Every structure is written in structure tokens, then in C-alpha cells.
């Protein structure tokens, strides 16, 4: 063994020194090689292009046939960074913000529109295969808080409609959305189409394009336009602040310097971010600095048979061509501040050194481009007395977001599926891809898949989409055949971009190709030798490890494992706590799989993610050994058999190597079979047997319920505890955020019924005095009942993850100190958990707020999380307290917004009423789970109809002249319930039928209740035309009235609950 290890050590040293030689050889070959960017035929062209740059001291020069380019050190070493950003937003405006305080300084072009703008001649004919963005099919509908007297005009899409979007970068990248194809990115930008026009495309339609460019010179200190080429309309500057701040280290108001910046997976940014500045740049606060910026308008008009069918307008903001060279050097932030645009119209200023968000600047629309303002050394020598219009003193450089993409957002860089966010502001229809705007990956997915039928609401397509890339535009869009812009078409405005500029001189000619140099031959010889010895070393390591593992196979009741735990102990002996991970290779058994739990812990299709507390290693302490021994004695060890297919059999349980999920700190979930039933198997390290047993105990107490994940059994080997639980299809987060992946499942689900199941499961836990404390979409699992005899509900919701659950003591209404503080997950924790400090002066643990008030932490914490889950489910992934970064801050402030429920009609009104109570800041004001289950949101149409008829019967006996106090309460705020006159909201045939029998007062709630009651009792006597309007009993009939008056049911419900709750006829509606 010693000789083998000696050989291994020698081989490792040899490989190490070989690699050093390899790197040296590669560097030598790189430095001695040359790059032939221009050949003799393009010599004149290259020189002409280089002549575009101003002849300054630092401009490139040609010496002895070699283009001498300045290095980054020479260009920026003595440069000064102006203390402001210039931000171009998708609504077309320009804004300037202070780099230190984030305060807006000025704004320009506030009426411009750089996104994709649509205009259409109202008199022109529009082919059915095209869609004007301003001419969608429209229907009148009443939604949310828009009552009968104020209907909301909503636009809809059909399968034949195609909607166009543009990403405001790289010449206006075009996207097309269609219900049949999803979102498709086209390979040609608007700029390409303009340069290729005129051209016939798309069923022989004629595309004619043009562009118009205006150059502005702007005083960046106040936003004044000092010159304009060509001169024309003068634009007004809106001044917010007249002078820039001068205190460099000041902290902006409201900025959170402790907020850690995280990537879309939820993990902190990599600590290996090495893209730091090499120089200290001075931030200038001078009063005057001038920059050039170009505004280019691209116009495309589409003709069909001489008729204009669509006009597209795209406006782009760019620096001048003189600044192209400087942009190529701009590879990192000068002052370590990177401005990232978000989908929610905010600009996050991130410190690239500390990886913290320093500022969050709210904008009126998302930022399209962010420019740094840099004054170069040679510009400092300009005579200030000269005309500023002729001598801009600074240059605009786009912020180098691409440089930081892979380091700060590794998942986006590695993700094979790109995501794109689409939305519109006014007449600007824009797209933002996560590769250009990384923070849009946090946006909710578009909810158009929630809708069935030929028409869907237009606003349901706005959100995050998985990009369906296609090499040919319009290839799969209905009625739009593929096309190619001919390669021989070259516009006179097309330009050749300079090659990537490095720090070394670039010769114009390359006399010696790299492949012929002697150093290149040496390089490949050394590479061959290094690879050969690396292969030998690899197989030597395998031989040594196999010889160490072989004796374990003879031990009884063990599985042959090559685990890192023992080796880690020898290397780090004496450490009491550390993380444990297992290794897995393609050829080894599943026990060697490395545990890499993600932030959300639910990245697979079939998952069961359960949190287990932090892992502790076995200690050499005698007391710890005694404890381990006593824990293992709780359950006799089972016979473990290693099967040839890689699976493991433990008694009647077979565990397969297929990983379906990861838990916290080394817990792995595998697919398995238990007594001919497919199951999920959690493998837990034996060091945590006691903690896992507590979770098993809670599962055993609570799993006798259709909406609690089912526990089957536990098995134990000498190293692991196997917990066997129900196998599920996915979790609620997967279903809502990835509806395309679960299309069949999604279409079969009634979301309101699903929410009732979740609440029903929570009610079971609360009836057992259990507080879950970690309710979130990732812990709501979904299982499909394939047999129709099992249940009327095809999809069942199951509550899982009891790792943080706590059983309350008898008559205890709150939680223990040791388990309360860290409970819950980000974004789903109640305000009392986030802001409270625990008082230990009472047996019932109390929460003291920052204002000194005392609150109890109890079942209300689950109700709060459940309210957030309700909103998340109904709105397609939205959160009532805002975006990821602002969520918990808004929870602490009690700031919420339920506006996205308005599009759900009467269901949205009921949901908003319930959710608003569930997420109340004070726990005592939140409803119990029994009240939640009895809310009208979960009533079927028959129950709603019965309730309204009972209310009508009850109030008919009240004195009307003068009205009784109870009747006055019913009529209170009637305009917000039924409008000025409810008769104007009903169908004319129904109103005519009403007038034949008696008179009704259109301003009274009691009268509309009487109409509903009378027409229900005399439904069979109604004319056929009126019955068709009202629909069938009870669903169609009830739906007609509650959709016309969405506040009517809720108004009556609150009156009965507050005043008439003791009357017997209403108890069945209020008691669970």
C-alpha cells in the first residue's frame, strides 16, 4: 500500500509540473502568434473604418504595418467617472440618476417610445392572419372592484392572432407570440429588416423600411440639449435636482446596505467574483460635462395590395461611433457599481465587490440601457471656453453586464432553456431576455395556460416565457410561411464592426501562421504527455480506492460504499461540526450521489423535498458514541442487499438509484418500491435519527388524512435511516411556474378546489394542535388519482415537510423559544416571526414588536402563509407583498397589493376578501382555519343561491317605512354593490318580464334580492328567451347574478356574519 501511495504522490507531482510547463508553452505560443484580422484585399477598408475615430493622443496608430492599440491601462488609468448614470427606459425617455444617492437628476424625451410601437389605418383591411396590437377582439366584462356601472373593457386573443414584441437591444430583437407556438425569437432584428428593405415577405406582403438619426449633445449636469444635428423640434428637460451630490460615502435614504444580492435560484452570489477593478477611479462632481448620444428611429411599413396593414416603429439610443473603441475596453465597472434592470420597473444598483444591493431605484418603466459617463484623459485638455457642442468632454459607455453574467448568474449562463419576459407600456410592446436582463428570471410566468377555450385575455400572455427558438422566422406561426432575407442584400447603412481589441499590438498582416511555429509543436507534444500521465494517474487512484473498499463487502448487514465521511474525519480530526456530502459517479451505486440541495430544494419533476436540520458528524467523544448507540437501538438493523442493477433492498423496501429530489444537508430522496407500490424514499444519515424520528412521529399522528402526505414505514441500515412516504407527481410551485411541463395535470385542476384541499389539510394539523410553520408552494405536493373510483377529485394536494412543525402543549397558543426564531422560509413568514423578539417572562411565548406591542405566535402563522399561497396560486405565481427583493420588507410594513385578482371576476372579489383577512398584520385579526373553509369562495353555486334566497326571506319581514336599522344596514353602501340602478345591468328581456308583475326600485339591494328569489321560485314559468339568458339551475342562474353583481354575495355574507350569526337559518353557512 505504501509503495502504491508513493507512486501516486510521484505521479501527482509530475502532472502538476507538466501542467505548469503546458501553461507556459501556451502563453508563449499565444504571445508569439499573430492574428490576421485584415488581409490585403481589405486593407483600404480597414483603414477607412479606423479613420472614424478622432485623432487624439490615445488614438490607435499604425507603425511598421502594425496597428498599435492602447491598453485598458492607458485608456482609463487617468479617466474620471462622472457621478451619474444615464438610463434609457423602454418608454423612450432618458433619465439621469446620482450614482451615490440614487436620486433622479433630470429626464428627457418623456413622450418618446423606443419599444415596438404599432399604428394602423382604421380604414384599411386587415388580413385574418395578422393582428393589429390596437385592434384586438373586445368584450365587456365586470371584474374585481369594477362594478356594474363601471364595466371593464378587456381584450382577448384567439389561435389566429399573432402578437409582436421587441427587445430594446442589438437593433431591436423581434419576438412573435401565438397561442399555438408560444413565444418565438426571430433571427432578424428590426434594424436588419430596415437595411434589407424593400423586400417581399409573408405571403407576398411588401416591407418598406427607413430610418432617421438625430445626434444630441447634452449637458449631463442638468440635461439641457446644447446642440442637435439636424436641428428640429426642441425637447424640454424636466429637472429634478440642479446639482449633483459631492459626498461620495453618503448612504442613500432607504438603501439597505445589508441586503445580500442573490441569483434567481435564491443562492448568494459566488464568492469567487474576481472581476474587480485594477485602478482607483476618481468620481467627478464637476458642474459641466457634455456627451453625444444618437437617437435612431427605425420605421417599417407593411403593405398588402397597396394597403397599409401595419406600421412598426422602433427607437434606439446609442453612443456615437467614435466611442466604439472605448466600449470594447469597458469590461468591468469603474466604481464597482452595476445597474441591473428588473421586470418590475426598478433599477437595482449592485456592488460587485461585496455582492450587496446598495440601491433600489423605482422607475416609471423598465430600464433598457444604462450608460456610464467617463471623461477620458485627452478630453480633460480641451479648452473649456470653446463651444461645448463641438467638443463633448465625456463619452457614454454601456454598462458591461455580459462580463458578470456567468459569475453572478451561473444558472442563467448554463441554462439550456432561455426565458424571456414580455409586457407592454402604453403602445410600447417590449421583451426582456434573461441573458440581457438577468433579473427578469424572477418574474412570474405568463398565465395564459390557465385559460381554456378559443379566446384568452390578452393580459394573460404578459409574464415570463420559455423561449421557443427557431432558425427561421415565422416558421411555425399559422399562416406565416418561412422566409430568408437574401444574403446578397446589403444596405448602404450597414457597417463592419471592429474585431475584439486586446492589449497587444495587432499586425495588419500575418506572415507566420500559428500552426507552423516551432513553439506550437512543443506545445502539442507536452499536451500529449500530460494527458497520458493524467490517464495513468486516474486508473492508479481507482485501483487504490478499490483495494480499500473491498474488505467492507464481507461485513454483515452493510452496503459497499466509498463514502467521504471517514476520510474527512482523518483529515479534519477534532472538528465537532461539518457538512457531509456523498459522491456519485455514473458507474457507482446510488449511495455515492453528491447532495447538492438548492435554495428551493425542488428542482426535479417528481420530487419530495423534506427539510432536515443541520447535519452533525459522528464525534469521537464517548458521550456522543453512547448517544449514537442508544439511538440506533430504537430500531433493529435490517438486512441490506446490494443488487446488480444498482438498487438496494432493505427488507421489503427496494430503493433505486434514481434521485427525485434533495433535502437539506445531505438528505436525498430516491424513487423506490415498497410492497409493490411506488414510493419516495428519504435517506437520512444516522447521526440524525432522533430528529428524523420526531418528524416520523408527527407524520404518524397526522397522515390519516387525504391531504397529508402518507407515511408507510421506516427501515434502518448501519449508516442510514430510510423513511418511506407517498410518491407525488410535482409540487404546487412546479405546477404554477412551469405549467407547460405539466400541461395535462394543469388542465384537469380546479384551482379553487385545490386551495380548499390545502386548507382542509391545514385544518387537520390544527385540530391536532400542530403548527406547520413552513407552509409554502414547494411543500404542497400534488398526486394524481389514476383510478376514477378512488376519488372524485383527480388531483390531490398533500401537505408535506414536517421538519419545522411543532406540537403545542395542552392549552398552549404559541411556540417555544428554541424553535420559533428560525421557523419558515423566505417570503412566506409572518410579520411576527420576522420582526419579533421573544419574551421569556411568560410560559406562553410572546412576541414583542419594535413598537413594544405584544403579540402571540400560534396557528395564525400558518394562516398568513396560507393566504400568500392562495394569492400565488390564483394569480399564476404573484406574491401579495411584491417581488423577491422587497417581499419581506413589505411584510414587515404591512404593505400588500391584491390588484391581480381583479381579472378573476366574482371569484377574484371573494378571494381578495378572504386573503386580505388571512394576511392581516395582527395575528389576532386573522381568521381561524374553520372560518377560511366556510368562506363563500369555496361555496358551490347551489349553496350561494340558497344563501341569497335565505337572506331575501329574512329581510322581507323587516319594516320598510320607516326602514328598520337592520334594513338600513343592508342598504348601506348600495352604490358600490349594485351601482346607481341595477336594472341597467340586466338583459332587456329580463327587465321587460319584471315590469309585467310589479315595480322594483333599481337602487335597492332588497329589490334585486327579491328578483333573484322570485325568478328562482317561478323559473319554470319564465319565457324560454328569459331562461336562456339566466341559464340552467343552479349554476347558470346563480352565475348570471353574481357575475353581474360580484359584491352582492360578499355584502350579504358579512352582514349575516356580523349581525345575524346566531339565527338558526344561517348557522349552516357559518359553522364548520
UniProtKB/Swiss-Prot annotation:
Q: Which residues does ADP bind?
A: 664, 682, 726, 728, 731
Cellular component, GO, one term: endoplasmic reticulum
What is the role of this chain? Endoplasmic reticulum (ER) membrane-resident kinase/endoribonuclease involved in unfolded protein response (UPR). Initiates the selective decay of a subset of ER-localized-mRNAs that is required to survive ER stress. Rather than relying on a transcriptional program to up-regulate genes that enhance ER protein folding capacity as in S.cerevisiae, S.pombe cells reduce the amount of specific proteins entering the organelle by decreasing the level of ER-targeted mRNAs using ire1-dependent mRNA degradation.
Q: Which reaction(s) does its UniProt entry say it catalyses?
A: L-seryl-[protein] + ATP = O-phospho-L-seryl-[protein] + ADP + H(+); L-threonyl-[protein] + ATP = O-phospho-L-threonyl-[protein] + ADP + H(+)
Cofactor(s) the record lists: Mg(2+)
Please tell me where ATP binds in this chain: 660-668, 682
What the entry lists under Gene3D superfamilies is as follows: KEN domain, Phosphorylase Kinase, domain 1, Transferase(Phosphotransferase) domain 1, YVTN repeat-like/Quinoprotein amine dehydrogenase
Which first-to-last residue range defines the signal peptide? 1-30
Cytoplasmic topological intervals: 540-1072
Keyword Ion transport carried by entry: no
Q: Which domain of life is it from?
A: Eukaryota
- Give the keywords, sorted: ATP-binding, Endoplasmic reticulum, Hydrolase, Kinase, Magnesium, Membrane, Metal-binding, Nucleotide-binding, Serine/threonine-protein kinase, Signal, Transferase, Transmembrane, Transmembrane helix
Q: Corresponding gene? A: ire1
Describe the outcome of a gene knockout.
Impairs ER stress-induced ER-phagy.
Q: Which residues bind Mg(2+)?
A: 779, 801
This one is known as Sensor for unfolded proteins in the ER ire1
Q: What is the lineage of its organism?
A: Eukaryota, Fungi, Dikarya, Ascomycota, Taphrinomycotina
The entry assigns this protein to a family as follows:
Belongs to the protein kinase superfamily. Ser/Thr protein kinase family.
**The Protein kinase domain covers which part of the protein?**
654-938
* Modification after translation, per record: Autophosphorylated mainly on serine residues; phosphorylation enables nucleotide binding by the active site.
Q: Does the keyword Ribonucleoprotein apply?
A: no
Origin species: Schizosaccharomyces pombe (strain 972 / ATCC 24843)
Region annotation Disordered: where it falls in the sequence:
243-262, 553-593
The membrane topology term of the UniProt record is: Single-pass type I membrane protein
**Active site residues according to the UniProt entry:** 774 (proton acceptor)
GO molecular function list: ATP binding; metal ion binding; protein serine kinase activity; protein serine/threonine kinase activity; RNA endonuclease activity; unfolded protein binding
Amino acid at each position: 500500500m505504501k509503495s502504491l501511495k508513493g507512486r501516486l504522490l510521484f505521479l501527482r507531482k509530475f502532472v502538476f509540473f507538466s501542467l505548469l510547463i503546458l501553461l507556459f508553452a501556451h502563453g508563449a505560443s499565444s504571445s508569439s502568434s499573430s492574428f490576421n484580422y485584415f488581409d490585403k484585399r481589405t486593407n483600404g477598408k480597414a483603414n477607412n473604418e479606423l479613420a472614424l475615430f478622432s485623432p487624439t493622443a490615445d488614438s490607435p496608430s499604425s507603425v511598421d504595418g502594425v496597428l498599435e492599440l492602447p491598453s485598458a491601462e492607458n485608456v482609463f488609468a487617468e479617466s474620471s467617472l462622472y457621478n451619474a448614470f444615464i438610463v434609457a427606459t423602454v418608454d423612450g425617455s432618458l433619465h439621469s440618476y446620482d450614482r451615490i444617492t440614487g436620486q433622479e437628476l433630470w429626464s428627457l424625451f418623456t413622450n418618446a417610445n423606443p419599444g415596438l410601437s404599432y399604428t394602423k389605418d382604421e380604414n384599411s383591411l386587415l388580413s385574418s392572419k395578422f393582428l393589429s396590437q390596437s385592434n384586438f377582439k373586445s368584450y365587456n366584462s365586470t371584474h374585481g372592484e369594477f362594478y356594474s356601472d363601471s364595466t371593464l373593457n378587456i381584450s382577448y386573443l384567439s389561435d389566429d392572432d399573432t402578437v409582436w414584441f421587441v427587445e430594446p437591444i442589438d437593433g431591436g430583437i423581434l419576438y412573435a407570440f401565438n397561442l399555438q407556438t408560444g413565444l418565438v425569437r426571430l433571427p432578424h432584428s428590426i434594424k436588419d429588416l430596415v437595411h434589407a428593405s424593400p423586400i417581399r415577405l409573408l405571403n407576398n406582403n411588401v416591407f418598406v423600411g427607413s430610418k432617421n438619426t438625430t445626434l444630441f449633445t447634452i449637458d449631463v449636469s442638468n440635461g439641457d440639449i446644447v446642440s442637435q444635428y439636424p436641428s428640429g423640434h426642441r425637447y424640454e428637460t424636466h429637472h429634478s435636482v440642479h446639482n449633483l451630490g459631492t459626498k461620495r460615502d453618503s448612504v442613500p435614504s432607504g438603501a439597505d446596505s445589508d441586503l445580500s444580492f442573490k441569483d434567481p435560484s435564491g443562492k448568494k452570489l459566488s464568492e469567487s467574483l474576481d472581476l474587480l477593478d485594477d485602478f482607483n477611479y476618481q468620481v467627478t462632481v464637476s458642474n459641466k460635462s457634455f456627451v453625444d448620444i444618437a437617437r435612431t428611429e427605425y420605421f417599417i411599413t407593411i403593405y398588402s395590395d397597396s394597403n397599409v396593414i401595419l406600421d412598426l416603429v422602433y427607437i434606439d439610443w446609442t453612443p456615437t461611433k467614435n466611442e466604439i473603441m472605448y466600449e470594447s475596453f469597458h469590461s468591468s465597472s469603474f466604481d464597482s457599481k452595476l445597474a441591473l434592470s428588473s421586470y418590475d420597473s426598478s433599477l437595482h444598483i449592485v456592488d460587485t465587490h461585496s455582492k450587496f444591493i446598495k440601491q433600489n431605484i423605482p422607475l416609471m418603466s423598465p430600464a433598457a440601457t444604462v450608460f456610464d459617463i467617463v471623461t477620458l484623459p485627452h478630453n480633460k485638455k480641451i479648452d473649456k471656453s470653446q463651444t461645448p457642442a463641438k467638443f463633448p468632454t465625456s463619452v457614454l459607455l454601456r454598462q458591461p453586464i455580459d462580463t458578470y453574467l456567468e459569475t453572478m448568474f451561473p444558472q442563467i449562463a448554463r441554462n439550456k432553456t432561455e426565458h424571456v419576459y414580455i409586457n407592454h407600456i402604453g403602445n410600447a410592446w417590449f421583451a426582456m431576455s434573461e441573458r440581457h436582463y438577468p433579473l427578469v428570471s424572477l418574474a412570474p410566468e405568463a398565465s395564459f395556460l390557465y385559460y381554456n377555450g378559443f379566446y384568452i385575455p390578452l393580459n394573460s400572455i404578459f409574464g415570463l416565457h420559455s423561449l421557443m427558438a427557431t432558425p427561421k422566422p415565422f416558421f411555425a406561426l399559422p399562416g406565416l410561411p418561412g422566409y430568408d432575407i437574401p444574403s446578397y442584400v446589403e444596405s448602404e447603412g450597414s457597417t463592419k464592426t471592429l474585431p475584439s481589441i486586446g492589449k497587444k499590438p495587432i499586425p495588419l498582416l500575418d506572415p507566420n501562421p500559428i500552426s507552423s511555429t516551432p513553439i506550437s509543436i512543443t506545445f502539442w507534444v507536452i499536451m500529449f504527455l500530460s494527458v497520458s500521465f493524467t490517464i495513468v494517474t486516474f486508473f492508479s487512484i481507482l485501483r487504490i480506492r478499490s483495494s480499500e473498499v473491498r474488505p467492507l463487502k464481507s461485513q454483515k448487514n452493510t452496503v459497499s460504499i466509498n463514502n467521504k465521511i471517514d476520510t474527512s474525519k482523518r483529515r479534519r480530526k477534532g472538528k465537532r461540526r461539518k457538512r457531509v456530502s456523498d459522491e456519485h459517479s455514473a458507474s457507482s451505486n446510488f449511495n455515492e450521489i453528491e447532495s447538492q440541495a438548492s435554495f428551493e430544494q425542488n428542482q426535479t419533476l417528481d420530487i419530495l423535498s423534506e427539510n432536515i436540520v443541520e447535519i452533525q458528524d459522528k464525534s469521537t467523544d464517548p458521550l456522543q458514541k453512547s448517544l449514537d448507540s442508544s439511538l440506533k437501538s430504537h430500531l433493529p438493523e435490517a438486512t441490506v442487499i446490494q443488487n446488480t442493477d444498482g438498487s438496494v433492498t432493505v427488507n421489503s423496501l427496494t430503493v433505486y438509484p434514481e434521485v427525485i429530489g434533495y433535502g437539506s444537508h445531505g438528505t436525498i430522496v430516491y424513487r423506490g418500491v415498497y410492497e409493490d407500490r411506488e414510493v419516495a424514499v428519504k435517506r437520512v444519515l444516522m447521526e440524525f435519527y432522533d430528529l428524523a424520528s420526531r418528524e416520523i412521529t408527527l407524520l404518524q399522528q397526522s397522515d390519516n388524512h387525504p391531504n397529508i402526505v402518507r407515511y408507510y414505514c421506516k427501515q434502518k441500515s448501519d449508516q442510514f435511516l430510510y423513511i418511506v412516504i407517498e410518491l407525488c407527481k410535482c409540487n404546487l410551485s412546479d405546477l404554477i411556474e412551469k405549467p407547460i411541463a405539466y400541461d395535462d395535470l394543469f388542465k384537469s385542476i380546479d384551482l379553487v378546489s385545490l386551495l380548499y384541499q390545502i386548507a382542509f389539510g391545514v385544518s387537520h394539523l390544527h385540530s391536532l394542535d400542530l403548527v406547520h410553520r413552513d407552509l409554502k408552494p414547494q411543500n404542497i405536493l400534488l398526486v394524481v388519482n389514476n383510478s376514477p373510483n378512488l376519488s372524485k377529485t383527480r388531483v390531490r394536494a398533500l401537505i408535506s415537510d414536517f421538519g419545522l412543525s411543532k406540537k403545542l402543549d395542552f392549552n398552549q397558543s404559541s411556540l417555544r423559544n428554541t424553535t420559533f426564531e428560525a421557523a419558515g422560509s423566505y417570503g412566506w413568514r409572518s410579520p411576527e416571526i420576522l420582526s419579533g423578539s421573544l419574551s421569556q417572562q411568560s410560559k406562553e411565548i410572546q412576541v414583542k414588536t419594535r413598537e413594544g406591542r405584544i403579540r402571540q405566535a400560534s396557528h395564525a402563522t400558518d394562516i398568513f402563509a396560507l393566504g400568500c399561497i392562495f394569492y400565488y396560486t390564483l394569480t399564476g405565481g404573484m406574491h401579495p407583498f411584491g417581488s423577491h427583493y422587497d417581499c419581506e420588507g413589505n411584510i414587515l410594513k404591512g404593505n400588500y397589493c391584491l390588484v391581480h385578482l381583479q381579472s378573476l371576476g366574482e371569484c377574484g372579489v371573494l378571494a381578495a376578501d378572504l386573503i386580505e383577512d388571512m394576511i392581516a398584520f395582527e395575528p389576532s385579526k386573522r381568521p381561524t382555519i374553520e372560518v377560511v373553509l366556510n368562506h363563500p369562495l369555496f361555496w358551490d353555486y347551489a349553496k350561494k343561491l340558497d344563501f341569497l334566497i335565505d337572506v331575501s326571506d329574512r329581510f322581507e319581514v323587516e319594516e320598510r317605512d320607516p326602514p328598520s336599522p337592520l334594513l338600513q344596514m343592508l342598504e348601506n353602501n348600495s352604490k358600490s354593490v349594485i351601482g346607481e340602478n341595477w336594472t341597467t345591468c340586466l338583459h332587456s328581456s329580463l327587465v321587460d318580464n319584471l315590469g309585467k308583475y310589479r315595480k322594483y326600485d333599481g337602487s335597492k339591494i332588497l329589490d334585486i334580492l327579491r328578483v333573484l328569489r322570485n325568478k328562482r321560485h317561478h323559473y319554470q314559468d319564465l319565457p324560454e328567451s328569459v331562461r336562456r339568458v339566466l341559464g340552467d339551475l343552479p349554476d347558470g342562474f346563480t352565475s348570471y347574478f353574481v357575475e353581474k353583481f360580484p359584491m352582492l354575495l360578499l355584502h350579504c355574507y358579512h352582514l349575516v356574519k356580523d349581525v345575524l350569526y346566531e339565527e338558526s337559518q344561517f348557522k349552516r353557512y357559518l359553522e364548520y
